[in-house]
């Protein structure tokens, strides 16, 4: 099923038809090892924020300075999410636990990690974005659910080490893939 989804999704358009993406599929023991190591790193960051320089993504996904209307949208989304899971403003412990759910792939059995060669430019990020959307649509058409995640990007060194990804690639994002648990609020 995963191979079928990726085959269909890889038909996405790309500049000069170079289809520059790579996808690393993670399940089983590798998934567990990856989750464990990245969660440990995130807990270390919670306790020692001064170590953040050790965990930087290779490209800026979000702006350094949020502006209107994006800051309002971001806050509304955050407040809505935390409200649904009963996390009050300032409750650092509960916020940290919720944040760790990202690095547990929200309990999905499959993690997909999307990379590009570092020499490629912005156009290739647009190309891989179309491919990623195709993955999400193809998965949904086959009864699976997805959650795209940029949260993994600062931990690319850990990911690359565990998955043996070459240093000439950069992590664009991850996707949690599985069946949604409809009994959960989020």
Predicted features by range, described:
Residues 1-186:
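Acidic, surface-exposed loops and disordered segments
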């Amino acid at each position: 099923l995963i191979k079928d989804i990726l085959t269909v999704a890889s038909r996405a358009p790309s500049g000069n038809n170079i289809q520059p993406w790579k996808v690393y599929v993670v399940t089983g023991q590798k998934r567990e090892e990856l989750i464990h190591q990245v969660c440990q790193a995130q807990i270390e960051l919670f306790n020692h924020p001064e170590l953040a320089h050790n965990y930087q993504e290779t490209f800026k996904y979000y702006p350094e300075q949020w502006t209107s209307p994006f800051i309002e949208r971001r806050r509304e989304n955050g407040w809505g999410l935390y409200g649904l899971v009963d996390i009050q403003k300032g409750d650092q412990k509960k916020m940290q636990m919720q944040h760790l759910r990202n690095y547990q792939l929200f309990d999905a059995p499959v993690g997909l990690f999307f990379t590009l060669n570092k020499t490629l430019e912005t156009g290739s990020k647009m190309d891989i974005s179309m491919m990623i959307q195709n993955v999400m649509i193809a998965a949904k058409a086959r009864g699976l659910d997805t959650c795209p995640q940029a949260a993994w990007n600062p931990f690319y060194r850990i990911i690359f080490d565990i998955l043996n990804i070459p240093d000439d690639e950069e992590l664009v994002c991850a996707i949690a893939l599985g069946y949604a648990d409809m009994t959960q609020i989020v």
